[in-house]
UniProtKB/Swiss-Prot annotation:
The keyword Nucleotide-binding applies. It comes from Actinobacillus pleuropneumoniae serotype 5b (strain L20). Nucleotidase that shows phosphatase activity on nucleoside 5'-monophosphates. A divalent metal cation binds at D8, D9, S40, N93. This is 5'-nucleotidase SurE. The lineage of its organism: Bacteria, Pseudomonadati, Pseudomonadota, Gammaproteobacteria, Pasteurellales. It is found in: Cytoplasm. The keyword Metal-binding applies.
């Protein structure tokens, strides 16, 4: 397959480098176009009010200067390259994209930019483990890359409809310790913690965003549940954000 890879951690990140190398070793044609720096949580932001510059690192690797993940894939699929691509893979992200994370995720946004291609895009993330409440890892990027290789033949069967993508989260474990794959729905987190107010060395007030919310819907069938039990979660998602279940109630009201 002719595969385009991007991410939100930057072209230098271990995750994207491991993924590209693994896919090339498996015989796929791989082109990497990614931000030149970490753009985590950029969501689907596009650069519209200023020009975009791209630095060619070598024949198959490109860095978008100050670009977002969505910029990268948008450029790649709309005239930057003469070639066409079969599939977009975004990742391997350094950390989870579970539940409500997908709203903010640059990893997921990059995959969504590829929704018009013949095969559903993949957003893949490596989920670090916790010890005494603290996250550590990510170490097993090779595991996540192998999971991608396992999934590609299934993706090529055309089971997933056009315009959908697969959001994939992989436990940070040796490949042999991963129990399998669960097809899941998105779970839900609580609201984020309160912002943190501080004072900089010059006396000006500054703010940090609070910590991410904790899972409040991690029941069986969710992506949170799969990861908690050492399974890979595969969740089909789409750009269509219509709340279809509310349409009739609104029609009846208006």
């Amino acid at each position: 397959m002719n595969i385009l890879i991007s991410n939100d951690d930057g072209y230098h990140a271990q995750g994207i480098q491991t993924l590209a190398e693994t896919l090339r070793d498996a015989g796929h044609s791989v082109t990497v176009i990614a931000p030149d720096r970490n753009r985590s949580a950029a969501s689907s932001c596009l650069t519209l009010m200023e020009p975009i510059r791209v630095h060619q690192l070598d024949e198959f690797n490109y860095a978008v200067i100050a670009g977002t993940p969505a910029d990268c894939v948008h450029l790649a699929l709309n005239g930057f390259f003469e070639q066409s691509f079969d599939l977009v893979i975004s990742g391997i992200n350094h950390g989870a994209n579970l539940g409500d994370d997908v709203v903010y995720s640059g990893t997921v946004a990059a995959a969504l930019e590829g929704r018009h291609l013949p095969y559903p895009s993949l957003a893949i993330s490596l989920v670090g483990r916790k010890s005494e409440g603290h996250l550590f890892g990510n170490n097993h990027f090779d595991t996540a890359a192998k999971v991608v290789l396992d999934l590609l033949p299934k993706v090529q069967k055309g089971i997933v409809p056009a315009r959908q993508i697969l959001n994939i989260n992989v436990p940070d474990l040796p490949y042999e310790q991963v129990k399998g794959v669960m097809i899941t729905r998105l779970g839900h987190r609580s609201p984020a913690a309160e912002i943190v107010k501080r004072e900089d060395p010059r006396g000006a007030t500054i703010y940090w965003l609070g910590a991410n919310g904790v899972p409040v819907d991690a029941s069986e069938g969710t992506d949170f549940y799969a990861l908690a039990h050492n399974y890979v979660s595969v969740t089909p998602i789409q750009a269509d954000m219509t709340a279809h279940y509310s349409i009739q109630a609104l029609k009846d009201t208006f």
